[in-house]
Structures are given as structure tokens and as C-alpha cells.
């Protein structure tokens, strides 16, 4: 049967992924362009049915990047989340015993003064609202299937996936072809498992001077707990049991707003015992008194898991390629010494935006180049990753 032809649409910038890095990039481009009297068309592609649909994360975040992007977010009434009130760090010795580390023994990078316990999905929804008010076009429900190259090998956009394809790979009754989203610059902010970013890193050998990337898996649940067991603003981290010798990782327990608690376990994916089940280790963890005293009598309301890019600066690839750049977890900007990555992801997107604005309308635009790498290496985000570069390897 005859199949419809693919259509195309052109923008100045296309951003793949409506996560913290991609949305921060979109907002920064439009804000700075307006200040400079420029008109820049920006499109954000999001595979989820809505922004935040594929983001399951309760996190403790620093507001440094948010403060730079929207200095008046507090005055504007954005309820970011629960301010951190207290830090606790434990070493779990076995299934029933634990030792709390004194505050002076906890690395400064894990102190959470002035930080917030937030829903990253809610943060992204708010950023998306700001982006749309600034004129960004956000297309939810569109998956970027591959990049598009021009005749010179420069990335010139992305192709969205076809819909209505049968199991045999042939068009079915409801077949709808994808679209070619063409752009002068393409920002990849897909997250840790971004397949387009992985392909770009390989094609342009962006990781040729970097260490192999390190990965972990994080299990997370959100619980509604009794009011008597809820301590708003309490942040608990720990390591040890149930992880055995040779297994890296740790747990977290965050007391958020509305009697909700975020609990999870992160396990490095280099464990030697092939019979280990990370999911079952997480279930064991919840029976430890340190965790159980909070969850007892509560109700689990949602759960999930995600991969984590945790190699840090030593495993960070080059961030620029002809026609585009990598931001956030697509590159690996998580600061593992802080167990935080939202602020550095947002900053990487904001720097990418600044680099693109500098390049548009110049000879660099024709070549698809920017000074993103240089700008990133001059930023506080890079300095933060540099300062913690030996935390994981040590």
C-alpha cells in the first residue's frame, strides 16, 4: 500500500528530552535571546505523554542553577519542595544494627544546608510552563528515533519515530510516519540511557580521552506514612548492609511534603556476584529498623527504577559535536560525591544555550561548531566535578 511521505519542520534549535537539562537550555535560550533582541525558534521533543511522565525522581537538589535561571522563583510563588531540616548518615552493620556518623565525620559534599527535597517531575512541569510562556514549542509524545546528518556529516536535526508499525516492521492500518525536525543546532538531553547520545559519542569518538563510564541502578519508592512517623525535611543517607563485600552503593530516605517519604537504594553495576538481585536487596533494606520505623503502617503509592551515570569528570566525554551538544546525564554531569545531578544538569543546559546564542549568525553556525566545551570548563559546574573527580575511584 502507499505510505504517506515524511514531513519536515525547521527550527533554530531542537532539544531532545524535557528533563532538567533540556528545559533549562530552552528557557535560557529564549530569555537571553529576548534580552539581546534576537528571535530564536526552539523546539523540545519529549517521549512521554506529558512533561514529567517519564521522570520518577524524588531528590535533594541545590538551587544554584535555578537561582541563576529564574532569580525570582520564590517571589513568583513556585513551591519547589520541602526545605531540608536535618541530615543523618548511617552505616548499617547488619540486618538490625546501625551506627550513626557524627556530623563532623560526614563529607562536606553531603551536607544539605539550604537544599530542598523535591519531585523532579514537578520541577520539570514548572520549567515547561516557563518555557512555553517564553515561546518554546514543546511536543510531548514524540520520540526522537535518530539524528539526521547533512552532506558534510554535520547533525542537522532529528527524526521522530513512525507510529502504527506492525511486529514485522511493516506499516499497519494506523500507520503514521514520523517527522524530520531540522535545526541549526541539536541539544541531546535524553538522560543516562539516551540511545541517540550513545550513538553520537561512538560516531565522533567523544569519549576517546575519557575513562570508561560507570553506571548504577537506583530503585525508588514513594510512601505515604502516618503523621507520627513523618519528619518533614529529614534527609537520611547510608551504606553497608544489605550490600555485601565488593558491592558499591547506598540508600536514601527523604521526608518530603504531605506525609510522603522517598526511599531508595543505589547499587553500582560492577558487582562480582552474578546471582545478586538488586531488587531483592532493596526489599531486604526496607526491613532494617532505620527504614522500617518510618515505613511501618504506611502505604507504597508508586515505585520504579532508573539507570544512573556516575563516572564523573574522569568519564565525561567531549560535550560538543558538529551540529550539537550533549547535556545532563546524556553526558554524565552527576556529582556523585553529593549524590546530586539536577543542578549540574541544568547548568550544562544553560551553558549550551549561551554557546548556541553566541554561534548563531556567525561562521560557526555554518560549521555547526560552538565554544560550549570551553564555556563549560570555565563554569562552576565543571569546577564542582573537578573537585570531586577522585571521589568514586578512591
What are these regions (language model features)?
Residues 305-336:
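FAD-binding beta-loop-beta segment adjacent to the flavin cofactor pocket
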Residues 29-33, 200, 204, 360:
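Active-site catalytic pocket residues across diverse enzymes, especially alpha/beta-hydrolases
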Residues 332-338, 354-394:
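Active-site-proximal substrate-binding core of FAD-dependent oxidoreductases
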Residues 36, 121, 125-126, 130-293, ...:
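Predominantly flavin-linked oxidoreductase catalytic cores and closely associated redox partners
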Residues 21, 50, 193:
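Conserved Rossmann-like nucleotide-cofactor binding loop
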Residues 13-43:
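N-terminal Rossmann-like FAD-binding beta1-loop-alpha1 element of flavoenzymes
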Residues 1-16, 20, 135-139:
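Glycine/serine-rich loop-strand microenvironments at binding/catalytic pocket rims
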Residues 39, 47-96:
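N-terminal FAD cofactor-binding segment of flavoenzymes
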Amino acid at each position: 500500500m502507499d505510505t504517506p511521505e515524511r514531513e519536515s519542520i525547521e527550527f533554530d534549535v531542537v532539544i531532545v528530552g524535557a528533563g532538567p537539562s533540556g528545559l533549562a537550555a530552552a528557557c535560557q535560550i529564549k530569555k537571553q535571546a529576548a534580552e539581546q533582541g534576537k528571535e530564536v525558534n526552539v523546539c523540545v521533543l519529549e517521549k512521554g505523554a506529558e512533561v514529567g511522565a517519564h521522570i520518577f525522581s524524588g531528590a535533594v537538589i541545590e538551587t544554584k542553577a535555578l537561582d541563576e535561571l529564574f532569580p525570582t522563583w520564590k517571589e513568583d510563588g513556585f513551591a519547589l519542595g520541602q526545605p531540608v531540616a536535618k541530615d543523618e548518615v548511617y552505616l548499617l552493620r547488619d540486618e538490625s544494627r546501625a551506627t550513626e556518623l557524627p556530623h563532623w565525620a560526614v563529607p562536606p559534599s553531603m551536607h544539605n544546608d539550604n537544599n530542598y527535597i523535591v519531585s523532579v517531575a514537578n520541577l520539570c512541569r514548572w520549567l515547561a510552563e516557563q518555557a512555553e510562556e517564553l515561546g518554546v514549542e514543546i511536543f510531548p509524545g514524540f520520540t526522537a528515533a535518530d539524528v539526521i546528518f547533512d552532506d558534510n556529516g554535520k547533525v542537522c536535526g532529528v527524526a521522530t519515530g513512525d507510529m502504527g508499525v506492525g511486529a514485522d516492521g511493516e506499516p499497519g492500518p494506523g500507520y503514521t510516519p514520523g517527522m524530520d525536525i531540522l535545526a541549526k543546532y541539536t541539544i541531546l538531553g535524553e538522560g543516562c540511557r539516551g540511545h541517540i547520545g550513545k550513538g553520537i559519542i561512538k560516531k565522533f569518538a567523544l569519549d576517546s580521552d575519557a575513562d570508561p563510564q560507570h553506571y548504577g541502578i537506583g530503585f525508588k519508592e514513594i510512601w505515604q506514612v502516618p503523621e507520627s512517623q513523618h519528619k518533614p525535611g529529614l534527609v537520611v543517607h547510608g551504606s553497608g548492609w544489605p550490600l555485601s563485600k565488593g558491592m558499591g552503593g547506598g540508600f536514601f530516605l527523604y521526608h518530603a511534603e504531605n506525609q510522603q517519604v522517598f526511599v531508595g537504594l543505589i547499587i553500582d553495576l560492577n558487582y562480582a556476584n552474578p546471582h545478586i538481585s538488586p531488587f531483592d536487596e532493596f526489599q531486604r533494606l526496607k526491613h532494617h529498623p532505620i527504614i522500617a520505623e518510618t515505613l511501618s503502617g504506611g502505604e507504597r503509592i508508586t515505585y520504579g527504577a532508573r539507570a544512573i551515570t556516575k563516572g564523573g569528570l574522569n568519564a565525561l566525554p567531549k560535550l560538543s559535536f558538529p551540529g550539537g551538544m550533549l547535556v545532563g546525564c546524556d553526558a554524565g554531569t552527576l556529582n556523585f560525591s553529593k549524590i546530586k545531578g539536577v543542578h549540574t544538569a541544568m547548568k550544562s543546559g544553560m551553558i549550551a544555550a549561551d554557546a548556541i546564542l553566541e554561534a548563531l549568525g556567525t561562521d560557526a553556525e555554518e560549521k555547526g561548531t560552538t565554544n560550549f566545551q570551553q564555556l563549560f570548563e570555565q563554569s562552576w559546574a565543571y569546577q564542582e566535578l573537578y573537585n570531586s573527580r577522585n571521589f568514586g575511584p578512591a
